[in-house]
Protein backbone atom coordinates (compact mmCIF):
# COMPACT_ATOMS: atom_id res chain seq x y z
CA UNK A 1 0.00 0.00 0.00
CA UNK A 2 1.22 3.50 -0.82
CA UNK A 3 0.41 6.21 1.73
CA UNK A 4 -0.69 8.86 -0.77
CA UNK A 5 -0.28 12.56 0.02
CA UNK A 6 -2.97 15.14 -0.82
CA UNK A 7 -0.44 17.20 -2.79
CA UNK A 8 -3.14 19.23 -4.56
CA UNK A 9 -4.33 20.46 -1.12
CA UNK A 10 -0.89 21.56 0.09
CA UNK A 11 -1.32 25.31 -0.57
CA UNK A 12 -4.74 25.50 1.08
CA UNK A 13 -3.56 23.49 4.11
CA UNK A 14 -0.57 25.82 4.54
CA UNK A 15 -2.84 28.88 4.18
CA UNK A 16 -5.02 27.45 6.97
CA UNK A 17 -1.97 27.10 9.24
CA UNK A 18 -0.98 30.68 8.42
CA UNK A 19 -4.47 31.85 9.38
CA UNK A 20 -4.36 29.91 12.68
CA UNK A 21 -0.90 31.13 13.70
CA UNK A 22 -1.76 34.73 12.74
CA UNK A 23 -4.82 34.52 15.02
CA UNK A 24 -2.79 33.04 17.89
CA UNK A 25 -0.18 35.81 17.66
CA UNK A 26 -2.68 38.66 17.11
CA UNK A 27 -3.04 39.52 20.86
CA UNK A 28 0.71 40.20 20.91
CA UNK A 29 0.60 42.64 17.96
CA UNK A 30 2.88 40.47 15.84
CA UNK A 31 3.75 41.71 12.34
CA UNK A 32 2.67 39.76 9.24
CA UNK A 33 4.08 36.23 9.18
CA UNK A 34 6.94 35.25 6.92
CA UNK A 35 5.83 31.84 5.61
CA UNK A 36 8.32 29.14 4.61
CA UNK A 37 6.73 26.19 2.75
CA UNK A 38 8.02 22.63 2.58
CA UNK A 39 8.59 20.46 -0.46
CA UNK A 40 5.24 18.75 -1.06
CA UNK A 41 6.77 15.25 -0.90
CA UNK A 42 10.04 13.50 0.08
CA UNK A 43 10.62 16.04 2.86
CA UNK A 44 11.09 13.81 5.94
CA UNK A 45 14.68 12.77 6.55
CA UNK A 46 13.80 10.10 9.09
CA UNK A 47 11.11 7.44 9.43
CA UNK A 48 10.31 4.53 11.76
CA UNK A 49 8.25 1.49 10.80
CA UNK A 50 7.05 -1.54 12.69
CA UNK A 51 7.58 -4.85 10.90
CA UNK A 52 4.58 -7.16 10.55
CA UNK A 53 5.19 -10.88 10.08
CA UNK A 54 2.41 -12.63 8.17
CA UNK A 55 2.43 -16.27 6.96
CA UNK A 56 6.12 -16.35 6.13
CA UNK A 57 6.10 -12.84 4.65
CA UNK A 58 6.82 -9.54 6.40
CA UNK A 59 6.56 -5.87 5.52
CA UNK A 60 6.64 -2.30 6.91
CA UNK A 61 3.52 -1.14 8.70
CA UNK A 62 2.28 2.03 10.38
CA UNK A 63 -0.73 2.72 12.59
CA UNK A 64 -3.55 5.09 11.72
CA UNK A 65 -3.43 7.84 14.36
CA UNK A 66 -7.22 8.00 14.66
CA UNK A 67 -8.31 4.35 14.44
CA UNK A 68 -5.02 2.74 15.61
CA UNK A 69 -5.52 0.22 12.79
CA UNK A 70 -2.32 -1.01 11.19
CA UNK A 71 -1.73 -0.58 7.47
CA UNK A 72 0.94 -1.87 5.14
CA UNK A 73 3.52 0.60 3.77
CA UNK A 74 5.53 -0.39 0.70
CA UNK A 75 6.58 3.16 -0.13
CA UNK A 76 6.34 6.36 1.89
CA UNK A 77 6.10 9.57 -0.19
CA UNK A 78 6.65 11.92 2.76
CA UNK A 79 10.08 10.34 3.43
CA UNK A 80 13.19 11.19 1.42
CA UNK A 81 13.75 9.45 -1.88
CA UNK A 82 16.80 7.77 -0.32
CA UNK A 83 14.64 6.21 2.43
CA UNK A 84 12.17 4.96 -0.18
CA UNK A 85 14.99 3.45 -2.25
CA UNK A 86 16.39 1.75 0.86
CA UNK A 87 12.96 0.39 1.90
CA UNK A 88 12.52 -1.08 -1.56
CA UNK A 89 15.98 -2.68 -1.61
CA UNK A 90 16.34 -3.78 2.02
CA UNK A 91 13.32 -5.99 2.59
CA UNK A 92 14.00 -8.48 -0.25
CA UNK A 93 17.54 -8.90 1.12
CA UNK A 94 16.27 -9.47 4.67
CA UNK A 95 13.76 -12.05 3.43
CA UNK A 96 16.57 -14.26 2.11
CA UNK A 97 18.21 -14.57 5.56
CA UNK A 98 16.28 -15.95 8.54
CA UNK A 99 18.94 -14.81 11.02
CA UNK A 100 18.30 -11.21 9.95
CA UNK A 101 14.51 -11.27 9.85
CA UNK A 102 13.72 -13.61 12.77
CA UNK A 103 12.11 -11.54 15.57
CA UNK A 104 12.78 -8.29 13.69
CA UNK A 105 10.04 -5.91 14.87
CA UNK A 106 11.08 -2.41 13.74
CA UNK A 107 13.29 -0.61 11.23
CA UNK A 108 14.38 3.02 11.70
CA UNK A 109 15.80 5.10 8.85
CA UNK A 110 17.78 8.36 9.15
CA UNK A 111 18.84 9.96 5.86
CA UNK A 112 20.62 13.18 4.89
CA UNK A 113 20.67 15.67 2.02
CA UNK A 114 24.31 14.55 1.62
CA UNK A 115 22.93 11.16 0.50
CA UNK A 116 23.94 9.15 3.57
CA UNK A 117 21.65 6.88 5.54
CA UNK A 118 21.56 4.99 8.85
CA UNK A 119 19.43 1.84 9.02
CA UNK A 120 18.65 0.50 12.51
CA UNK A 121 17.22 -3.02 12.82
CA UNK A 122 15.38 -3.62 16.12
CA UNK A 123 14.86 -7.15 17.50
CA UNK A 124 13.07 -9.09 20.21
CA UNK A 125 16.09 -11.38 20.64
CA UNK A 126 19.75 -11.28 21.66
CA UNK A 127 22.06 -10.46 18.76
CA UNK A 128 24.94 -12.94 18.49
CA UNK A 129 28.01 -13.57 16.34
CA UNK A 130 25.87 -15.25 13.67
CA UNK A 131 23.67 -12.15 13.41
CA UNK A 132 26.72 -9.89 13.17
CA UNK A 133 28.23 -11.93 10.32
CA UNK A 134 24.91 -11.89 8.44
CA UNK A 135 24.57 -8.13 9.03
CA UNK A 136 28.07 -7.54 7.63
CA UNK A 137 27.11 -9.42 4.47
CA UNK A 138 23.89 -7.38 4.22
CA UNK A 139 25.83 -4.14 4.56
CA UNK A 140 28.36 -5.23 1.92
CA UNK A 141 25.51 -6.02 -0.47
CA UNK A 142 23.91 -2.60 0.08
CA UNK A 143 27.25 -0.80 -0.34
CA UNK A 144 27.73 -2.70 -3.59
CA UNK A 145 24.39 -1.32 -4.78
CA UNK A 146 25.62 2.23 -4.22
CA UNK A 147 24.21 3.08 -0.80
CA UNK A 148 26.38 5.14 1.60
CA UNK A 149 25.07 3.61 4.81
CA UNK A 150 25.65 2.72 8.42
CA UNK A 151 23.93 -0.42 9.74
CA UNK A 152 23.00 -0.82 13.41
CA UNK A 153 21.38 -3.69 15.30
CA UNK A 154 19.41 -3.08 18.47
CA UNK A 155 17.92 -5.40 21.07
CA UNK A 156 17.14 -5.10 24.77
CA UNK A 157 20.24 -3.61 26.48
CA UNK A 158 22.24 -4.27 23.30
CA UNK A 159 23.46 -2.16 20.39
CA UNK A 160 25.81 -3.32 17.63
CA UNK A 161 27.26 -0.71 15.25
CA UNK A 162 28.99 -2.33 12.30
CA UNK A 163 31.07 0.81 11.82
CA UNK A 164 29.71 4.00 13.38
CA UNK A 165 26.45 5.34 14.84
CA UNK A 166 26.34 8.64 12.96
CA UNK A 167 26.18 10.28 9.54
CA UNK A 168 27.42 13.72 8.55
CA UNK A 169 24.84 16.03 6.99
CA UNK A 170 25.70 19.10 4.90
CA UNK A 171 23.28 22.04 5.14
CA UNK A 172 23.49 25.22 3.08
CA UNK A 173 22.74 28.56 4.73
CA UNK A 174 22.81 31.59 2.42
CA UNK A 175 25.20 29.79 0.09
CA UNK A 176 27.57 28.63 2.86
CA UNK A 177 27.87 24.90 3.62
CA UNK A 178 27.92 23.57 7.19
CA UNK A 179 28.65 19.99 8.29
CA UNK A 180 26.38 18.58 11.00
CA UNK A 181 27.04 15.21 12.62
CA UNK A 182 23.75 13.40 13.24
CA UNK A 183 23.74 10.57 15.78
CA UNK A 184 21.40 7.59 15.55
CA UNK A 185 18.54 7.72 18.06
CA UNK A 186 19.22 11.41 18.87
CA UNK A 187 17.08 14.39 17.93
CA UNK A 188 17.61 15.93 14.49
CA UNK A 189 15.34 18.31 12.58
CA UNK A 190 13.08 16.03 10.49
CA UNK A 191 12.62 18.33 7.49
CA UNK A 192 16.08 19.35 6.25
CA UNK A 193 14.90 21.76 3.54
CA UNK A 194 12.72 23.69 5.99
CA UNK A 195 15.51 23.51 8.58
CA UNK A 196 17.79 25.36 6.14
CA UNK A 197 15.09 28.05 5.81
CA UNK A 198 14.84 28.29 9.61
CA UNK A 199 18.60 28.75 9.87
CA UNK A 200 18.58 31.47 7.19
CA UNK A 201 15.72 33.30 8.94
CA UNK A 202 17.55 33.13 12.29
CA UNK A 203 20.77 34.42 10.69
CA UNK A 204 18.84 37.29 9.06
CA UNK A 205 17.14 38.26 12.35
CA UNK A 206 20.42 38.44 14.26
CA UNK A 207 22.52 40.22 11.62
CA UNK A 208 24.43 43.26 12.91
CA UNK A 209 24.08 41.99 16.49
CA UNK A 210 26.39 43.34 19.14
CA UNK A 211 27.76 41.38 22.07
CA UNK A 212 27.32 37.66 22.70
CA UNK A 213 24.65 34.98 22.24
CA UNK A 214 23.32 32.47 24.75
CA UNK A 215 21.47 29.42 23.40
CA UNK A 216 19.46 27.00 25.56
CA UNK A 217 18.67 23.47 24.28
CA UNK A 218 21.27 23.57 21.46
CA UNK A 219 21.10 19.88 20.43
CA UNK A 220 23.90 19.13 17.97
CA UNK A 221 24.52 22.85 17.51
CA UNK A 222 22.05 23.14 14.64
CA UNK A 223 21.38 26.85 15.19
CA UNK A 224 24.43 28.01 17.16
CA UNK A 225 26.86 26.81 14.45
CA UNK A 226 25.13 28.97 11.82
CA UNK A 227 24.51 31.93 14.16
CA UNK A 228 28.09 32.16 15.49
CA UNK A 229 29.07 34.38 12.53
CA UNK A 230 26.80 37.17 13.87
CA UNK A 231 28.23 37.34 17.41
CA UNK A 232 31.48 37.98 19.27
CA UNK A 233 31.00 34.81 21.37
CA UNK A 234 28.32 32.12 21.73
CA UNK A 235 27.57 30.07 24.86
CA UNK A 236 25.20 27.11 24.39
CA UNK A 237 23.70 24.51 26.75
CA UNK A 238 22.56 20.94 26.06
CA UNK A 239 21.79 18.03 28.41
CA UNK A 240 22.06 14.91 26.17
CA UNK A 241 25.60 13.49 26.02
CA UNK A 242 25.44 12.24 22.38
CA UNK A 243 24.18 15.65 21.24
CA UNK A 244 26.96 17.44 23.14
CA UNK A 245 29.57 15.16 21.54
CA UNK A 246 28.08 15.80 18.08
CA UNK A 247 28.03 19.54 18.75
CA UNK A 248 31.72 19.49 19.75
CA UNK A 249 32.54 17.68 16.49
CA UNK A 250 30.48 20.19 14.49
CA UNK A 251 32.26 23.13 16.12
CA UNK A 252 35.66 21.70 15.12
CA UNK A 253 34.57 20.50 11.65
CA UNK A 254 33.14 23.93 10.75
CA UNK A 255 36.13 25.81 12.26
CA UNK A 256 33.91 27.79 14.64
CA UNK A 257 36.25 29.53 17.08
CA UNK A 258 33.78 31.50 19.22
CA UNK A 259 31.28 28.82 20.37
CA UNK A 260 31.38 27.04 23.75
CA UNK A 261 29.00 24.16 24.62
CA UNK A 262 28.24 23.22 28.23
CA UNK A 263 26.33 20.09 29.28
CA UNK A 264 23.53 21.23 31.56
CA UNK A 265 19.79 21.79 31.47
CA UNK A 266 18.21 25.21 31.05
CA UNK A 267 17.00 24.98 34.66
CA UNK A 268 20.55 24.23 35.92
CA UNK A 269 21.98 27.06 33.84
CA UNK A 270 19.40 29.42 35.34
CA UNK A 271 20.58 28.36 38.82
CA UNK A 272 24.22 28.94 37.82
CA UNK A 273 23.49 32.39 36.37
CA UNK A 274 21.53 33.38 39.48
CA UNK A 275 24.31 32.11 41.77
CA UNK A 276 21.98 29.59 43.44
CA UNK A 277 24.60 26.82 43.22
CA UNK A 278 27.96 26.02 41.63
CA UNK A 279 28.48 23.35 38.98
CA UNK A 280 31.65 21.33 38.43
CA UNK A 281 30.78 21.26 34.71
CA UNK A 282 31.32 25.03 34.59
CA UNK A 283 34.88 24.75 35.89
CA UNK A 284 37.13 26.77 33.59
CA UNK A 285 34.23 28.74 32.10
CA UNK A 286 33.89 32.34 33.29
CA UNK A 287 30.23 33.24 32.84
CA UNK A 288 31.11 36.86 33.63
CA UNK A 289 33.30 36.99 30.50
CA UNK A 290 30.16 36.73 28.36
CA UNK A 291 28.16 39.84 27.53
CA UNK A 292 25.08 38.03 26.25
CA UNK A 293 22.41 40.49 25.20
CA UNK A 294 20.76 38.04 22.79
CA UNK A 295 19.26 34.69 23.78
CA UNK A 296 18.08 31.88 21.51
CA UNK A 297 15.59 29.26 22.71
CA UNK A 298 14.12 26.25 20.91
CA UNK A 299 12.37 24.47 23.81
CA UNK A 300 10.48 21.16 23.90
CA UNK A 301 6.71 21.14 23.26
CA UNK A 302 6.04 22.15 26.87
CA UNK A 303 7.68 25.55 26.24
CA UNK A 304 9.80 27.47 28.74
CA UNK A 305 9.27 26.92 32.46
CA UNK A 306 8.51 29.92 34.67
CA UNK A 307 12.07 30.42 35.93
CA UNK A 308 13.54 30.22 32.41
CA UNK A 309 11.00 32.79 31.17
CA UNK A 310 12.31 35.15 33.86
CA UNK A 311 15.89 34.42 32.78
CA UNK A 312 15.05 35.04 29.11
CA UNK A 313 13.46 38.41 29.95
CA UNK A 314 16.87 39.65 31.14
CA UNK A 315 18.10 39.78 27.53
CA UNK A 316 17.50 42.67 25.13
CA UNK A 317 16.81 40.39 22.17
CA UNK A 318 15.08 37.00 22.19
CA UNK A 319 14.98 34.57 19.27
CA UNK A 320 12.35 31.91 20.03
CA UNK A 321 11.70 28.89 17.80
CA UNK A 322 8.66 26.88 18.89
CA UNK A 323 7.26 23.48 17.90
CA UNK A 324 4.08 24.26 19.85
CA UNK A 325 2.52 27.71 19.19
CA UNK A 326 0.12 27.27 22.14
CA UNK A 327 2.94 27.06 24.72
CA UNK A 328 4.75 29.81 22.79
CA UNK A 329 1.71 32.04 23.36
CA UNK A 330 1.67 31.09 27.05
CA UNK A 331 5.28 32.29 27.26
CA UNK A 332 4.52 35.43 25.21
CA UNK A 333 1.94 36.48 27.85
CA UNK A 334 4.99 37.19 30.05
CA UNK A 335 7.66 38.01 27.46
CA UNK A 336 5.53 40.69 25.78
CA UNK A 337 5.31 42.59 29.06
CA UNK A 338 8.95 43.56 28.50
CA UNK A 339 9.51 42.87 24.77
CA UNK A 340 7.74 43.42 21.44
CA UNK A 341 7.63 41.05 18.47
CA UNK A 342 9.77 42.48 15.67
CA UNK A 343 9.44 39.51 13.29
CA UNK A 344 7.35 36.33 13.16
CA UNK A 345 7.54 33.27 10.93
CA UNK A 346 5.76 30.02 10.12
CA UNK A 347 7.94 27.08 9.07
CA UNK A 348 6.01 24.15 7.58
CA UNK A 349 8.16 21.39 9.07
CA UNK A 350 5.25 18.93 9.11
CA UNK A 351 3.08 19.21 5.97
CA UNK A 352 -0.40 17.64 5.95
CA UNK A 353 -0.56 17.70 9.77
CA UNK A 354 -1.81 20.29 12.25
CA UNK A 355 1.70 20.76 13.67
CA UNK A 356 3.18 24.22 13.24
CA UNK A 357 6.75 25.38 13.78
CA UNK A 358 6.88 29.09 14.62
CA UNK A 359 9.60 31.68 15.11
CA UNK A 360 9.46 35.06 16.84
CA UNK A 361 12.16 37.71 17.14
CA UNK A 362 11.59 39.90 20.19
CA UNK A 363 13.22 43.23 21.06
CA UNK A 364 13.10 44.92 24.47
CA UNK A 365 10.54 47.74 24.58
Curated annotation (Swiss-Prot):
Belongs to the class I-like SAM-binding methyltransferase superfamily. RNA M5U methyltransferase family. TrmA subfamily. PROSITE patterns: SAM_MT_RNA_M5U, TRMA_1, TRMA_2. This is tRNA/tmRNA (uracil-C(5))-methyltransferase. SUPFAM superfamilies: S-adenosyl-L-methionine-dependent methyltransferases. One of its GO terms (molecular function) is tRNA binding. The active site is at residues 323, 357. It comes from Pasteurella multocida (strain Pm70). One of its GO terms (biological process) is tRNA methylation. Transmembrane segments: none annotated. Keywords: Methyltransferase, S-adenosyl-L-methionine, Transferase, tRNA processing. The gene is trmA. GO terms for cellular component: cytosol.
Amino acid sequence: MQALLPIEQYDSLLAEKQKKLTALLAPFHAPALAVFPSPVQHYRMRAEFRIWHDKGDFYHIMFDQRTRQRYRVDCFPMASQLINQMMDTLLPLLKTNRVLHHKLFQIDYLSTLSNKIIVSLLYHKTLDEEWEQAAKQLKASLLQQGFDLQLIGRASKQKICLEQEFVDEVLTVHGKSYVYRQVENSFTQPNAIVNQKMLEWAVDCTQNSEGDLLELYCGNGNFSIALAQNFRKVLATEIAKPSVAAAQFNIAENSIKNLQIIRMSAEEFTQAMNGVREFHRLKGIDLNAYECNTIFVDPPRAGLDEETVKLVQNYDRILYISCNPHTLCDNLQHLCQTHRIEKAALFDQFPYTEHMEAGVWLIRK
